[in-house]
């Protein structure tokens, strides 16, 4: 499962991690490959296709074949590996997968920016990326749903009176100073594009509060 993969990496290969997260850590890695899973972190690192270097699969006739692998470049013939990715199990069953990992950045943070209109929120996403900032994730949050969900699970959504819709940003950096600088820049860009307020989750408890509501 994705949970067991993440647990193994955290204990044994701490410098690297697997960013893809479809929303459920109970997901099977083989299923993620064959479904071409995505998730909110696709903003920075792409969907599952971006991570898969190779797969060993079982074809409908029982043949077991290896497609791709650890090579950085392989342009021999048809790219059957990417034909299978996203085929939803109709062409083969995944037995093994060779995955691309990324350097683990020690500091992660969450930022909520509030807007009066959906148009301002959507425009801000593009402006942040134009500034060269690629967040780990960014998600549009309907205020009524966010507040209602928070009340249902006995949590508190940080924005209630400011604006009508929110953007939830997740960012990661190598240092704490860089994290706050990035979050501050995002907040400033959003404010220049119609944001009426912003809140940075200061610690892991506040971040977990936002993610649980999300």
Residue ranges of predicted features:
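C-terminal substrate-recognition/cap domain of FAD-linked oxidoreductases
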Residues: 102-103, 112-117, 122-214
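FAD-binding subdomain of flavoenzyme oxidoreductases
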Residues: 2-139
């Amino acid at each position: 499962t994705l949970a067991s993969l993440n647990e193994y990496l955290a204990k044994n290969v701490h410098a690297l991690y697997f960013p893809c997260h479809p929303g459920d850590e109970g997901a099977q890695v083989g299923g993620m490959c064959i479904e071409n899973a995505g998730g909110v972190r696709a903003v920075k690192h792409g969907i599952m296709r971006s991570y898969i270097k190779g797969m060993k699969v079982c074809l409908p006739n029982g043949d077991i074949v290896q497609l791709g692998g650890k090579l950085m470049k392989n342009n021999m013939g048809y790219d059957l590996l990417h034909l299978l990715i996203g085929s939803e199990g109709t062409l083969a069953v995944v037995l093994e997968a060779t995955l691309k990992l990324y350097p683990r950045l020690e500091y992660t943070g969450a930022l909520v920016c509030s807007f009066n209109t959906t148009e301002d929120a959507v425009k801000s996403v593009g402006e942040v990326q134009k500034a060269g900032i690629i967040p780990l994730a960014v998600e549009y949050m309907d205020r009524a749903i966010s507040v209602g969900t928070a009340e249902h699970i006995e949590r508190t959504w940080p924005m209630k009176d400011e604006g009508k819709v929110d953007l939830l940003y997740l960012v990661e950096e190598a240092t704490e100073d860089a994290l706050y600088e990035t979050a501050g820049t995002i907040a400033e860009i959003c404010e220049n594009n119609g944001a009426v307020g912003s809140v940075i989750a200061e610690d892991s408890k506040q971040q977990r509060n936002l993610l649980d509501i999300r």
